[in-house]
Amino acid sequence: MKAKEIRELTTAEIEQKIKALKEELFNLRFQLATGQLENTARIRQVRKDIARMKTIIREREIAANAKK
C-alpha cells in the first residue's frame, strides 16, 4: 500500500489495518518457521506497510499538537 493511499484513510481505519497486518505478519513468521512460506519477500513488504502507517499516524499527531 502506498503512502498516498494510506493518507486518504482515517486514523481509525489505519489502526485497524495495522492490527490486520500484524496478524498477517505473525502468520507469515509462523509459516517461515515451519517451512511453508513460499514468498519470503511478503514479510518485508508487510513490515514496511506497518511502518508507513505508523509514520503517517505520528505525522498527524505532531500536526495536531502544532496547531494547539
Swiss-Prot record:
GO biological process, one term: translation
Family: Belongs to the universal ribosomal protein uL29 family.
Cellular compartments per GO CC: cytosolic large ribosomal subunit
Keyword Membrane: no
Protein name (record): Large ribosomal subunit protein uL29
InterPro entries in alphabetical order: Ribosomal_protein_uL29 (IPR050063), Ribosomal_uL29 (IPR001854), Ribosomal_uL29_CS (IPR018254), Ribosomal_uL29_sf (IPR036049)
Single GO term (MF): structural constituent of ribosome
Gene designation: rpmC
Species this protein is from: Geobacillus sp. (strain WCH70)
Pfam families assigned to the protein according to its UniProt record, in alphabetical order: Ribosomal_L29 (PF00831)
Keyword set, alphabetical order: Ribonucleoprotein, Ribosomal protein
